[in-house]
Amino acid sequence: NMKTLLSETAEYSYTPDEKVIASGYKAVETNGFENKTIKAYRRPNGKIGIRNEIWIVPTVGCVNKLAERLANTAKVKDGIDGIHAWIHPYGCSQMGGDHEQTRTVLADLVNHPNAAAVLVLGLGCENNTVEKFAELVASRSPEGEGSDITQKGRIIYLTSQNSTDEIADGLAALDKLQDFACNNKREDVSISELVIGMKCGGSDGLSGITANALVGQICDRFTSSGSKVMLTEVPEMFGAEQMLMNRCINKSIFDKTVDLINKLIVGTSIDTVSEVLEYQVKPIIAQYVKQHEVLYNAFYSALSNFTSERDVK
């Protein structure tokens, strides 16, 4: 019933999809799709990029406005798909695991193959210092630890407090980075090298019936051809998690998936449907109908009845 549908942990069984295993983990017949090629940029480290962009990565949120101004002011040269600032509110006043997680995510952005060149923008007083961050970027680059932290002109580091005119210096750096990247050319690469990121479909009334099903079939076609697909927003997997678990390549991956689901979906401070209604649904309804007191009272009364001791099947 609705009262006991969710608990602190959920139990799952490792029942591999025999059809998928027998096919060598090809969920669908590819019918030659695996032989197709795409046009992409081959990076010096061997990775492929779909776009040839210049990225501005702030080490700290304090320079977000500077990053945005530089991205909006710089003139995009021929051969460059765009200049983008990846702003965020982090990089300072963080400690321990939170601080390291921020640094790791930002370093991986700098090393992303869609970024033909990168301007790393720091302030100077943040605890994610430009100097230490450059070392992390080098250690996490595909070339491995000890590689040139400027990656032969691909990365420029700018600390705004060390500059008398950070706008002029930033624009000059972006100009150099574009000169470095504008001669990159697309070439034919195998579809198997493609990495696709999935995004939430909006969670409307039809996404689980139409859009998600179609996207799933597309993912099957690509992964069966050797491509990689990354699923995001783990709570959206709720209800289909056992199906995904049945595709785990081994018991170890299955166990990690179960832990992920239990940690991010079920194992929260709100662990029953009644509590979800009380602490999540009701506030949302109140937000949208608070201007209509009569309608609000009717909704609240209905939900109060719904979350009573009565079982709902």
Task: Briefly describe each language-model feature range.
Residues N1-K313:
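Metallocofactor- and cofactor-centric catalytic cores in central/energy metabolism, strongly enriched
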